[in-house]
Amino acid sequence: MPQERSKPLKSETSAADGPPDYRLVGRHGMFPRTSHDEIERFNFLAHMNRHLASQVLPGVQAAFEARVEPAQLRREGPFRTRHAVRKALLAEPAFQVWSALRRATMEQRQQAGRWVTLRQGEALNARADELTDGDDRLQLDPGMRTPRYLTAVDHHCMPGSYHGEVIPGDVTGAANYDCGLFATTGGALGRFNDGGGRAVAAWVKEQLPDFKPRRILDLGCGLGHNLLPLALAFPTAEVIGVDAGAPMLRYGLARAKAMGVDNVRFVQADAEDLSRFADESVDWVQ
């Protein structure tokens, strides 16, 4: 029987100020398995990102108010556009420090996530295929042309962005996104990274208590972090997620099924063209 640890004296403790331990992250049947060292990498990044957001970024605002904005007012008058603000901040040391560190943690976060997912890629892909094979709630379009604004850059520094595939039927990019977002946000979105969707659902229920949507359309749904809370909050509605990235959609349906959420559909499409949906056929678009 393990020995009970003695409780520290109150004078020796202080309230925790930081993200929760990665071991508390919400896990489901599609979630990648993590080793001790992989967990601690995510813990370091979560704490670093929380520190940058809570301690370093406010210093950028202070520098803007104390140096950048007064210099602009003396030189040309008020800033006219956000682009002008950004250009001025690029020369500010406080912004340079924050920006360099934030970029570094994002690159490290992608390295950490890919170490986790690529080593078990075959197992993840097989698990997703087993859960989604023959399910008409996954509607992929191999002939869809991915818009250039998605192919021109690796969004969030993720190699291949959200649409890239290492092998046919790949879900490793989506799994990387799912297991690493907790570290990116410092746990701010909750155990399942679904805080945004839960907040929207709660607000709608409070503000529109009689609203009973039959169909909800989520554009740019990714793997469904914000889609599933809507499906759970409105169980009689069909919640349809649209995204350009096939890996995200494969993983999204597999994740939904692993979590026991059935009233969902994942559709690969360019959100610029929604002609497949008839006019007035949905009650809620987001």
Describe each PLM feature range.
Residues L217, L227-D273:
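Class I SAM-dependent methyltransferase SAM/SAH-binding core
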Residues M1-E92:
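Generic N-terminal amphipathic/basic segments
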Residues F211, D262, E280:
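Structured loop/turn residues at beta-strand edges in well-structured enzyme cores
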Residues L181, T185-R191:
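Solvent-exposed beta-strand/loop surfaces, strongest in extracytoplasmic domains of secreted
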